[in-house]
Amino acid sequence: MSVSILVVDDETDVAELFRQHFRREARNGTYVMHFANSGEEALDKLTAGIEPQPIVILSDINMPQMDGLELLREIKTRRPDLPVMMGTAYGDDERRRLAGEYGAACFITKPVDFDFLKTQLRDLSDAAD
């Protein structure tokens, strides 16, 4: 079974970075990656029904307009069962606390440790099975 992931980040180079680090897994069908450049675009994709449906979302916190914390709250209102991993380059304790309070599955710091991220994704996909 493929694990479908929606990565949300306003930095345009993030999609390419994820494609590089998940190249092998994408090729063998372990992961299917979807990308959105804003919280609004992520909600549009979830509403439109991208296939396969994401079983986990990885969102940046610091984005213009709808930030990652607002996105997290909206996703948890619509799909409380969908795990959302939050990422940021800033070690802000208050944002980390809020992310946990709003229902984040875990917190990832940037630059991303892709080995750690893959372990987290495996754990979440095993829990979803």
Residue map of PLM features:
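Two-component/phosphorelay signaling modules centered on CheY-like receiver
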Residues: T12-F35
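Helix N-cap/capping motif at the beta->alpha junctions
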Residues: F35-T47, G68
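Active-site beta3 strand of CheY-like receiver
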Residues: E51-L58
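Receiver (REC) domain active-site loop signature in two-component systems and cognate sites
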Residues: M63
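Alpha4 helix (beta4-alpha4-beta5 surface) of REC/receiver domains from two-component response regulators
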Residues: E70, Y90-I108, F116-T119
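Receiver (REC) domain switch/active-site region of two-component response regulators
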Residues: D113
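Receiver (REC) domain switch/output surface
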Residues: L117-D129
